[in-house]
Amino acid sequence: MDAYEATKVVFSRIQALDPDHAAKIMGFLLIQDHGEKEMIRLAFGPEALLHTVMAKARKELGLLPASGPGTPTSVAAAAAAAHSPFMLSRQNSGRCGTAPSPLSVSSPSSWAPPPVFSRNNSISNGAGEEMVGLGDELISPANGGGPPSPFFGGDPLMDELQLQDQLAFLNEGGVPAGHQMPMFDGGECRSPGGGDGGLFSYNLGWANGGPGHRRSASVSELCLGGADGLGWKPCLYYARGYCKNGSACRFVHGGLPDDAAGKMDPSAVEQQCQDFLIRSKSQRLAAAAFPYSPTGSLPGSPSAATKCLSLLLQQQQQQNESQRAAAAAALMLGGDEAHKFMGRPRLERADFASMMNPGSRQIYLTFPADSTFREEDVSNYFSIYGPVHDVRIPYQQKRMFGFVTFVYPETVKLILAKGNPHFICDARVLVKPYKEKGKVPDKYRKQHQPGERVDFSSCTTPTGLDARDPFDMHQLGARMLQHSNSANEMLLRRKLEEQQQAAELQQAIELHSRRLMGLQLLDFKSRAAAAPTPIGNPFSASQTAANATGESPPDSGELGKGSGFLLAHKKAVNGADKEESTGESSSPNTDSDQSVEHNLPDSPFASPTKSAGFARDPFAPTEAEISATASTGCSATYVGINNGASNGGTNHLLPSALDMPSPKPYFFPMSRLASDHGAIGM
C-alpha cells in the first residue's frame, strides 16, 4: 500500500468517527509530514490509536471533542498508550487555569516515579480528557531500528509559528457553514505567551519568550465575530501601520463596514472586554505564583486580550472624533441641532490632547476699568456658548483684562465668529483670541532693516496683545467663514503690528537702562574722587618735619639725611620707588631744592603699609628731638637718637649704634630740581 491509499483509508476512518472536523484533522496530519510509514500505521492500527491521534489534533486545533458513541474511554486510551513501551511526551499547549501533570518518562528497565517539574505540560482535566494527555505520549519508530521519535514532533524544538501559519487555510471561509468553528473561550485555545511562563516553563518556543500565536483563534473572531462565525476581521498589521498583503489581504483595511456598527451589540462587546480583562488578570496571577520559572521574569508578549481592547478603544476614539466634528459643524452653522452638543457631561479620552494646548481653549477679554461684574457673571454669560472651565480676572484696583478658559476649542471658535462687542452687566466687553509668545514668519521679518534690533519675544501685556482694538472682530468673524484667506492676512497683519510695538517698547527700555547706567558711572566716579588716598599721606609728616627742623640745629638735619640714606642703601633691593620716597621723606629741610612736593610715590597703586612705614621711620627721631630739645638741648638729641636705635625702641629698621658708621662720609649732596623748575605738583 502506498501513501496515497493509506491517506484515503485514514481519512475515511476519521470521517466515520468525527464527520464535523474530519477535514481539519486530516489536514493537520498531512502538515506534520511524518512519512509513509506513519500513515500506513494509522491506516491499519487499532481504533484506540486513531482516537488518540484525533484527540491530539483537536487539542492542537482548539476544537471541541465530538460527543458520540465512538468516543473512547480512558481505559482504551491507556491501552493504546501501553502499545508502545517507550513513551516520550511532546511539548504541547494546555488550557489556562489547570495544573500541569508530571512527565512520564518510562523505559522497560526503569519505572521510577516521574519528576514533578517536567518538559511536558499536558493537561488532564477529568476522565474525558485523560486520553488527550496519553495521546501526547504516542511515539513510533523512525528509520527502522533507530530511537523512537514522537509522532507529532520529530524535532522537539520545531518552530510553532510556522506550524500555525500553515494551519491558517483551515479557518478560511471555504469550509461549509455547518463546519464553521463556533465561538469559544479565547483563553483556552491560544498558546500561552511569554507572560504565561509561570505555568508553562518548558513549552515549545515559550522558553525564549516567543509570542503566543493561534491562527485558529484570531482576535477578529473573538471580538467581532458574528453569530454565523464569519464576522468582520480588521487587519491588525494595517492598524499598526503597514500590511504586506495590501488590497489582497483577506482582512478588512480602514475600519469596519458601515453596517458593522449596527450589527454589533454594545452590551456584548462590553461583556467580552470584561471577560478579557478578568482572564488576563488571572493569567498574571498564575504567572506570579511561579516566580522561579525560567521565563517568569521575561516580558510578556501582547496577548489576544490586549489586541482586542486596543482595537475597541481605537474604534471608540474614531467615533468620538466624528461626533466632535459634527458638533463643531453644527455650532458654526448655528442650526437647530446646535443645542444637542452644548452640554457634553464629561471629557472623552481624545479630549486630553486639546488640554495639552490651553491656548486653543482660551479667550482674552478687555473691558472698562469701571466695570463691576464678577467672575461668576462672566462664567454665566459665556456658558451660553459652551461649558466654561475657568475664569481669571486679575485682582487690581483698575482691572481692564481677563481670561476665560472653555472645555472645548469649538466654543472659542464660535465666540470669535460671533464678533464684538459683548455686554456683561451693562459693561462693554471685547473678545480677542488668546495667543502665546511666538515669532513672526520670515517673510514679515524681512521687512525690518538689518541694523534694527528687534525682540519678538517681549510683549506689552501678559498675553502679548495690546489694549487697543484697531480691527473690528465682528468683521473678522464674518469673514472667517467666507474668506479664510483675508482673515488670515488680517490676523498676521495685526500680529506684526503688535510685535513692532513690542520691539519699540524694548528699544525704549534699553535706552532708559543705558541712561541709568551712565548716571551710576558718574556717581561712582565722583565718589572715587572724594574718597581718601589709600597710601600714606606725606603732607602731615612733612609739615611736622618742617616745623621740627626750625628748632633743631643743622647737624640734626644732616643726621636725618644720613640715617635716611643708610636705610635707602640697605633696602635698595625693594625697588626704586621705595628708595626715592625714603630719600625724599628723610630730608626735612625747607630749602627750595628739597621741596615737599617730591614726596609723591612713582606708582599710585603702591602698598599703603610700606609707604606709611617709610614715611614714619625718618621722622621718628625728629619727634624725639622735639621733646628732647625743650629739656636738655641739642646734645641730648643725638644721644636720644642713638639710644633709641640701639635699644630697639620705636624703629626696628634702624641699625644699632655700634654698627652705625659716621653719617658724613656717606653723605653725597645731590642737586634737585626746585618746584618752580618743572617739579610735579598735586
Swiss-Prot record:
It holds the Pfam family RRM_1. Residues 100-110 have a biased composition (Low complexity). Residues 485-521 form a coiled coil. Residues 361-437 form the RRM domain. A zinc finger (C3H1-type) spans 229-256. Residues 539-550, 583-593 have a biased composition (Polar residues). InterPro entries: AtC3H46-like_PABC-like, AtC3H46-like_RRM, Nucleotide-bd_a/b_plait_sf, RBD_domain_sf, RRM_dom, Znf_CCCH, Znf_CCCH_sf. Residues 441-455 have a biased composition (Basic and acidic residues). Residues 91-111, 441-460, 535-616 are annotated as: Disordered. GO terms for molecular function: DNA binding; RNA binding; zinc ion binding. Keywords: Coiled coil, DNA-binding, Metal-binding, RNA-binding, Zinc, Zinc-finger. This is Zinc finger CCCH domain-containing protein 53.
